[in-house]
Amino acid sequence: MQYYQIWCNLRDSHRDLEFCENVRAYLGHLKDAGKIEGFTITRRKFGFGPSELGEFNITISTRDMEQLDAAFSMVAPREGRLEELHRAVYSMVTDFRSGLYRDFPDPERVGASKP
């Protein structure tokens, strides 16, 4: 599995529930289209964690890089309903950070045992 990690803060923290609804609508659309396997939304608790990573963490799961690339290709035109859903999320965000992680050891690693 590949995990696209997003950390962010909200421009207006009073709109936290609206933000989560918007993320669910946007990423749910990608999941329904088979472009991602799933996602989670988590929020820092009691302020614990590095401030540079932001209060919210969104983890987007894909089978492999091919599926992740297909998701990015679907979003890239930035038009239509998908862009409306995307805009509803990114317009609420500040301090965006992202990273790409994988299960490890992964199947491509020589000498890795299978689970």
Regions found by a protein language model. Name each.
Residues 42-48:
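Short, solvent-exposed loop/turn elements at beta->coil junctions and helix N-caps
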Residues 2-9:
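Active-site-flanking beta-strand signature of metal-NTP-handling nucleotidyl enzymes
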Residues 1-2, 49-52:
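Short, flexible turn/loop "capping" segments at secondary-structure junctions
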Residues 95-115:
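Acidic/histidine-enriched, glycine/proline-rich intrinsically disordered or flexible terminal extensions
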Residues 21, 73-77, 113-115:
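Short intrinsically disordered coil segments
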Residues 14-41:
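Short amphipathic alpha-helical segments
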Residues 10-13, 64:
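Structural beta->alpha junctions
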Residues 29-37, 51-55, 59-100:
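An amphipathic, aromatic/His-enriched active-site/gating alpha helix that lines ligand/cofactor pockets
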